[in-house]
């Protein structure tokens, strides 16, 4: 029985030891435990902040911002208060803490979070004062986590390492302790009136600070960056500014300008109608007038138009004679089109609008307007005209007037066909013979078709152009009859 008791006691002791080890393993590690250096040597700053806020500050720091600072080298951390709504920012020095142990990062973060908590809860707004409230929270967190949060950090070696720009005063203060005239800074900022101690230094010493130390190749790097930064800017500026010695290429304006509301009737420089061509036309018409005497008071008013400007000339109306049939044969009537854009030329030639008698150029009845196209009439041969023209006729002298106001010409009007479009109309005057004028119109309209001969594509016989359609029908019907008769045989 003694053996059984001894065995039971031994088993109980082993069980207790296992339970103790299990309980010790289940206990959470301290925030500054050495094992964290291997488990998580570079923790996430935001994750640590959220964890500590819920664990030690009851979630009161949700409106606080935490971030790294790359330029801050004088202190390990700082808490900045922003506004009255509980907004503040915590910044930790990346240059000082990136090579320090994880323990220093945790303690510095908790230190600044205590300052933020005191500001948010309106207990203490002086971030430099580590008074009773600050010490109370500091000891509370130290007892819970095993950390060693202090009032000031001890990273003096790292701070001195980043102070690579040195200045020394050449006045009496270079012999006074504790600084002996030295000013050491991490940035290249020379001592000046912006420093709070500058006024006192000027009173007690009055010396000037001379730079005695800076990082290696610092001045060369600065000059290189300045050169690289200036060259592209100068190149871009010189690109836009022309050189004074170089001659600038002057490109004249090749477009066409318009003045709104301009009613000038002066001819434009680009007019193609010349007085020489008008004189030749007058000579041609005067010859026909001398051969066939017509009422001398009957005149034709010709208006030469181009780009909205006009030029008027009065010509004696020619009479129709047998010798003039060659000229009239070049005219053949066309049906007028509603779309006036179709009457445009390619070379920008002008148009001539003609009104008969003493009727104004715009007093033309809309019901009596029609268009007649003409072929090229050579002035050298006295049978062709080189200028494009459009004749504006009127059959009813006492009819209603159709005004055509001056409009700004479109760009498409520059391109006009080589052929000229002519409108003409014979007006009855008091001294003219109506029978004679009727025969003249009939002869002029039928002369073109009666004088021209064309070959029939079926029988190859010469036929008048006016009868070609009837002849083709007759030839095709005859061929079809022959084919049917051959098939029936």
Curated annotation (Swiss-Prot):
Effect of residue 149 to A: Abolished ability to mediate autocleavage in presence of ssDNA
Cofactor: Zn(2+)
Domain of life: Eukaryota
Upper classification of the organism: Eukaryota, Metazoa, Chordata, Craniata, Vertebrata
Bilayer-spanning residue ranges: none
Organism: Homo sapiens (Human)
Protein name: DNA-dependent metalloprotease SPRTN
Subunit-structure text: Homodimer. Interacts (VIA PIP-box) with PCNA (when ubiquitinated). Interacts (via its SHP-box) with VCP/p97. Interacts with RAD18. Interacts with KCTD13 and POLD3.
Zn finger (UBZ4-type) location: 453-480
């Amino acid at each position: 029985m003694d053996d059984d008791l001894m065995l039971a006691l031994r088993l109980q002791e082993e069980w207790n030891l296992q339970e103790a080890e299990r309980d010790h393993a289940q206990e959470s590690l301290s925030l500054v435990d050495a094992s964290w250096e291997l488990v998580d040597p570079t923790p996430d700053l935001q994750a640590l902040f959220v964890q500590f806020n819920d664990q030690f500050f009851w979630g009161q720091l949700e409106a606080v911002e935490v971030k790294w600072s790359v330029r801050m080298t004088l202190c390990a951390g700082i808490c900045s208060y922003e506004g009255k709504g509980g907004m503040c920012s915590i910044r930790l020095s990346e240059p000082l803490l990136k090579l320090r142990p994880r323990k220093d990062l945790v303690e510095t973060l908790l230190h600044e979070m205590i300052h933020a908590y005191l500001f948010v809860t309106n207990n203490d707004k002086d971030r430099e004062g580590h008074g009773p409230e600050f010490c109370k929270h500091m000891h509370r967190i130290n007892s819970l986590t095993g950390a060693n949060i202090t009032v000031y950090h001890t990273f003096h070696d790292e701070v001195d390492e980043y102070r690579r720009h040195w200045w020394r005063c050449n006045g009496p203060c270079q012999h006074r302790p504790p600084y002996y005239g030295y000013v050491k800074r991490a940035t290249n900022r020379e001592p000046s009136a912006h420093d709070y101690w500058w006024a006192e230094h000027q009173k007690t010493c009055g010396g000037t600070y001379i730079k005695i130390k800076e990082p290696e190749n610092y001045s060369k790097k600065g000059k290189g960056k300045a050169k690289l930064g200036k060259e592209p800017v100068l190149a871009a500026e010189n690109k836009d500014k022309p050189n004074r010695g170089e001659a600038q290429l002057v490109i004249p304006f090749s477009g066409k300008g318009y003045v709104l509301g301009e009613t000038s009737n002066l001819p434009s420089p680009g007019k193609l109608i010349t007085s020489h061509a008008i004189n030749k036309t007058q000579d041609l018409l005067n010859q026909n007038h001398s051969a066939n005497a017509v009422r001398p008071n009957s005149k034709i008013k010709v208006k030469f138009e181009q780009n909205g400007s006009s030029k008027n000339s009065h010509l004696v109306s020619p009479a129709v004679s047998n010798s003039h049939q060659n000229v009239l044969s070049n005219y053949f009537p066309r049906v007028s089109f509603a779309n006036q854009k179709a009457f445009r030329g390619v070379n920008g030639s002008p148009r001539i609008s003609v009104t008969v008698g003493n009727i104004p150029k715009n007093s033309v009845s809309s019901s009596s307007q029609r268009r007649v196209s003409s072929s090229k009439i050579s002035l050298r041969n006295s049978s062709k005209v080189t200028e494009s023209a459009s004749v504006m006729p009127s059959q009813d002298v006492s009819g209603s007037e159709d005004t055509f106001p001056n409009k700004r010409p479109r760009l498409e009007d520059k391109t006009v066909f080589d052929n000229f479009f002519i409108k003409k109309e014979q007006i009855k005057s008091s001294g003219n013979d109506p029978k004679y004028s009727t025969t003249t119109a009939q002869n002029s309209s039928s002369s073109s078709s009666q004088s021209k001969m064309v070959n029939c594509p079926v029988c190859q016989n010469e036929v008048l152009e006016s009868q070609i359609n009837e002849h083709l029908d007759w030839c095709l019907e005859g061929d079809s009859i022959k084919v049917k008769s051959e098939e029936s045989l």
